[in-house]
């Protein structure tokens, strides 16, 4: 029950403490038609608050007017009753329409085959190198110096014919006249059967 006091009030008046607004409202109990009021019937009278009252700051603004129910109307209660409740999220979604559906998945392109044509594995034929052909020495006994030096057999000897001495010996061998050796009698009578030394005179 709210705290009440009659201290300093006229007969029939009572002061009742309002916990919300931290102040007294006054009621004339001698008049059944009287309404509760916030103003003290005695001007300049200040009634101290109850001993166990909370001294926190009261709500801002003056207290509302009292009705016949002898209970002060609170502005917060009136405001909460008048304010409509917020619409649920489902109602808001229906009001604005359903959310757009995502785009259907795009058809993928067929994967292209990755291949390369087979390259011919061949190399152009390399020309075969001819093997050097060494000519056989000529049967003629007399040759010119240029013929001997140009002979691949001679040039192939390399180190055997290197040096001036070897060349000099070769020159003398080729410049030497040919010699014919006769065998005594030789059972041919020195070719007498062919006209009496016809062939022999050519050699002497």
Swiss-Prot record:
SMART domains with a match to the protein in the record: WW
InterPro entries found in the cross-reference section: WW_dom, WW_dom_sf
Record keyword Nucleotide-binding present: no
UniProtKB keywords: Cytoplasm, Nucleus
Spans annotated as Disordered: 32-117
The organism's place on the tree of life at top rank: Eukaryota
Subcellular location: Cytoplasm; Nucleus
Bias (Low complexity) ranges: 66-100, 108-117
Residues annotated as domain WW: 7-43
Cellular component annotations (GO), alphabetically ordered: cytosol; nucleus
Name under which the protein is recorded: WW domain-containing protein C11B10.08
Gene source species: Schizosaccharomyces pombe (strain 972 / ATCC 24843) (Fission yeast)
Lineage, broadest ranks: Eukaryota, Fungi, Dikarya, Ascomycota, Taphrinomycotina
